[in-house]
Structure formats: structure tokens, C-alpha cells
Swiss-Prot record:
Name of this protein: Pantothenate synthetase
Record: residues binding beta-alanine: 60
The gene coding this protein: panC
Residues at the active site: 36 (proton donor)
EC main group: ligase
Cross-referenced InterPro entries: Cyt_trans-like (IPR004821), Pantoate_ligase (IPR003721), Pantoate_ligase_C (IPR042176), Rossmann-like_a/b/a_fold (IPR014729)
Localization terms from the record: Cytoplasm
Catalytic activity annotation: (R)-pantoate + beta-alanine + ATP = (R)-pantothenate + AMP + diphosphate + H(+)
EC number: 6.3.2.1
Length: 282
């Protein structure tokens, strides 16, 4: 079922609650791929009803970013969601989601000071606002987010905790192409040559992981190795290479417990992100 109005969706949710159904939510910006499908299928497995939102959120894009060019295909997305087991696809307009004169913002300080938050200053304010709206409208028991957007996942978990929102936030593993490239809607921007060059993200992270497993626990040294590997690809331009505490997302000077190794790289004009977590077993 395709729903575009908040009021109608809320009426559907009320009816589900009357019957005691559990509800799962997957929020997306559309142009769905196997990464999204893995979230939907997990939600379907764990809940009686599943809502998938398909909404390119204008408030999380900064000036000169790709809001207008972001790929959209609601007909294809709707079929993809239904084939994956979703109950409802919620596809509101920006006017439906944001009242004229909207002046409410949500800022999760600290967690957004580094990584993508530092490079895209308006991004997480927009993410938090729209996700809080979806959680308020759908009131899901569980909501599912991909670990590829590791900072987003951490920020949303913190927001939900701080605002006492009664939804369990569940992180789901990164889904990759056979050659290791993390699935992303933005991969469609890549030319054939750029697509090959994009493999440098996973290659550089694999190198870092090997070094960590060997016992190289110097974060600056690991960052240097990643940087050198990425710079060996002429189409790649580094946005950031960071090693941070996996919970606080603060940069670490030494590796003592769980860390997140995260990178953002421009391949041509396309900005791609990737990461992995590493747990030090003492």
C-alpha cells in the first residue's frame, strides 16, 4: 500500500495497534538497493507490520549538495518494497512533512562534531529532525538503520535515548557488491572508470584491518596507511580519514577498546563513505 498523507498513515497505525500488531520502520531516501532490502527483510522477520519511508529529505542537504540530482524512482521503489515484504510505503511530499515556517531543530552535540558532521554542518540536524518525525508518526517498536552510515546510527541512538522515544534502534551490517564496494544509491553516479576506482575505499580499509589484527595499534600510523593507499588512486580525493571511539565518535590517540575506522572519499564528483569497527580484545 502506498500512502502519502500523515493523517492516513496514523489511522492505519491506530488500527494496527488495536489488533496488537508490532511495527517495524525502515527510513530511506529511495532508489533502493540490496542494502535497503536487507533492512526491510530483517524488519519483516521481526515485526507483524513494516512501514518503509521513501523521502528525499531536503533539510539534510547543504548548499551545492546533490538534493536536486539525487536519484528518484518511486514506482520502482514501491514494487521493491512490496516484493521485500513491506506492508506500507510512506512517500510524503516535502510540504506534507514540513509545515510552512517550521522552526524546530534537533542537535545531538558532540557526536556530530567530527566525521561527516564536520564536513556537512547542516546534515545531521536535518537527519535528526526527519527521523524524529517518522518515529513520531509511525511509533514503531523497532527501527532499522544501516551500519554504513555509522555516525548517523550513533546519532539516532543517542537522540532516541535522550528524548525517551520508545523505539528500539537496530543497526544492520553493511551490504557490499561482490567486489567489496559498499552498496549505495550514489554508486549510480559513477562512470565505469570511477566505479573501478571506487574499490579503493574497501581496499584501504582492508589494509587497515590487516594491520590492526597484526597488532599495529597506532592510530596515526593506520591513518597514514589508509591515506597513502587512497592517494594511489588518481580519481580519488580524500574528504576525511578518521579513527574514533565507536561510542562517543571522538578521535582516539591510542587504541584501547572499540574503535570506528571511517573514511569519506570523492571519486570524481561523487562522495562515498565506508567504515568498519574494530574491537580490541584485551
Amino acid at each position: 500500500m502506498l500512502v502519502k498523507e500523515i493523517k492516513l498513515l496514523r489511522n492505519i497505525i491506530k488500527d494496527w495497534r488495536k489488533h496488537g500488531y508490532s511495527i517495524g520502520l525502515v527510513t530511506t531516501m529511495g532508489f533502493l538497493h540490496e542494502g535497503h532490502q536487507s533492512l526491510i527483510k530483517k524488519a519483516v522477520k521481526e515485526n507483524d507490520k513494516v512501514v518503509v519511508s521513501v523521502f528525499v529529505n531536503p533539510t539534510q542537504f547543504g548548499p551545492n549538495e546533490d538534493f536536486n540530482s539525487y536519484p528518484r524512482d518511486i514506482d520502482k521503489d514501491f514494487k521493491y518494497c512490496m516484493d521485500s515484504g513491506a506492508t506500507v510505503v510512506f512517500n510524503p511530499s516535502p510540504e506534507e512533512m514540513y509545515l510552512k515556517g517550521n522552526c524546530t531543530t534537533i542537535n545531538v552535540s558532540g557526536l556530530t562534531d567530527f566525521l561527516c558532521g564536520a564536513k556537512r554542518p547542516v546534515h545531521f540536524g536535518g537527519v535528526c529532525l526527519v527521523v524524529s518525525k517518522f518515529l513520531n508518526i509511525v511509533t514503531p517498536d523497532k527501527a532499522y538503520f544501516g551500519e554504513k552510515d555509522a555516525q548517523q546510527l550513533a546519532v539516532i541512538k543517542r537522540m532516541v535515548k535522550d528524548l525517551n522515544i520508545d523505539t528500539e534502534i537496530i543497526g544492520c551490517p553493511i551490504i557490499r557488491e561482490n567486489d567489496g564496494l559498499a552498496k549505495s544509491s550514489r554508486n549510480t553516479y559513477l562512470s565505469e572508470e570511477e566505479r573501478k576506482s571506487a574499490l579503493i575505499l574497501n581496499k584501504s580499509l582492508s589494509l587497515a584491518k590487516e594491520e590492526l589484527v597484526k597488532g599495529n595499534l597506532n592510530p596515526e600510523n593506520i591513518k597514514e596507511l589508509i591515506t597513502a593507499k587512497i592517494n594511489s588512486e588518481h580519481l580519488a580525493k580524500i574528504d576525511y580519514v578518521e579513527i574514533v571511539d565507536s561510542e562517543t565518535l571522538q578521535p582516539v590517540k591510542q587504541i584501547e577498546h572499540s574503535i570506528l575506522v571511517a573514511i569519506a572519499v570523492f571519486i570524481g564528483k561523487t562522495r562515498l563513505i565506508d567504515n568498519f569497527t574494530f574491537e580490541l580484545n584485551i
